[in-house]
Amino acid sequence: MKCDKVLPSAEKGGISMAVYIGLITIGAAMTIETFLRHALLRRWYDLFLALPVWLGWFLAATALYFLLLYLLSLTVDKTKPVQKKSSFYRWLLNETAWLILRLGRIRIECTGLEKLQGLPPFLLVANHRSNFDPFIAIVACPRSGLAYIAKPEIFDIPITGSVVHKCFFLSIDREDNRKALGTILRAAALLRDGTVSIGVYPEGTRSKMGELLPFRNGAFQIAKRAGAPIVIAKTTGTEQIAHRFARRRTVVRFDILDVLSADTVAKMTTREFGEYARAQMLQSEPATSTKKEAITV
């Protein structure tokens, strides 16, 4: 099964990427014109002017794209809870995630995506190795409508904070148990109503050394309260993105390890969830997978 049969246009860039590429194409045309004009004049040393022309246009197109996103984000009031889905902001999130990975020269190799076909909204549980992890899952599973439970600082990031707020991402205060419980209940309600699928990192923070950190099993309460299935996934290689971004291609893996049905979830305790999910992540060996799907961005 090819990824282009599984993923919608957001994975391939869609409309915003078409506009972006259109601007780059204009820059390329200007570069060619400069090249030919100076070639006809036989001033070979002036041909080097073509590169700055194209580079300047590329940077201008990129800056314009993100400037428009920034201006749009200023219209979002992040103090008000989101009441209904926004197809526009979901589309924008998928497109921007794709563009960021494209600019970063990141290639995603996936296994197990076929397990998500026909699945109702679910709780996605995965390991956490990089700030790019949510982007990987969003691009790999654009039809799932993922919304993550994230630390409050994420919502202070320009553009990002506004877009994810409109897509039902939730802030969690780990220092205040009462507020944290409120976030868990809100996530369970969204999942139960079928509004979004919820993504969590039970480690609670990024693993800086690559090892799997102890789980905080409270996050599994979301699936139990919502009566929803749990999807166990593993991300590999994202810790390399930050120091290679745009300079070198980075290949990362996103593997769907197992899916626990809602009936199975109802019979297990949160501790059992944690132990099982952790064991799956530790025992998984992506290199032995027989069905691999590549998403080139």
Q: Model-flagged regions — what are they?
A:
Residues P8, K12-P121:
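Membrane-anchoring hydrophobic helices of lipid-metabolizing enzymes
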Residues S73-E95, R102-L103, G118-N177:
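Catalytic core of membrane glycerolipid acyltransferases/transacylases, capturing the structured
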Residues C110, L124, Y148, F254-I256:
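Generic preference for hydrophobic
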Residues T111, I149-K151, D173-R174, P202, ...:
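Thr-Gly-centered strand-to-loop micro-motif
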Residues L103-R105, R143, V164-K166, D193, ...:
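Short, well-ordered coil/turn elements that cap or connect secondary structure elements
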Residues G13, L181-V297:
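Non-catalytic C-terminal accessory region of glycerolipid acyltransferases
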